[in-house]
Amino acid sequence: MLFKSGIMEALHQLGLCDAVYGKLYSYLFGWEPRGVVLHQVKYPSVQEVIATAKAAGAVLVFAHPTVYKSMPLVRQLAKEGIIDGIEVEHPRNSPEDRAECAALCEQYGLIHTGGTAFHGPNHKVPHPVGT
């Protein structure tokens, strides 16, 4: 997959900008003001993603559900046996968030995971591997 940070890293390595997350990044991809190449992404529905992943034999782990206020959906998917795990360990989870996610894993026999906050070195707020 090609992400904005990958594009910017290549431009930075070529000497075409002085930082991965600098003025050029804001000009191209910024939210306020809107970047010149940023467009509204059309995401598939949750049901479509689940069906595609399951058809491919994937293990479905819901990453950082508390960050995006997705706990009602996580509770539903866990109860229905649709997901296989929940990311419990995440830098932005409060102790209460961790406790609720861990309890759901225990209740429904789900995998207890962590580590999706590591996005490599090209991130505004880098987190070490495993966070």
Model features per residue range: what roles?
Residues 50-51, 55-59, 66-131:
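Charged catalytic cores and adjacent phosphate/nucleic-acid-binding surfaces used
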Residues 1-76:
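Extended substrate/RNA-proximal surfaces in nucleic-acid metabolism proteins
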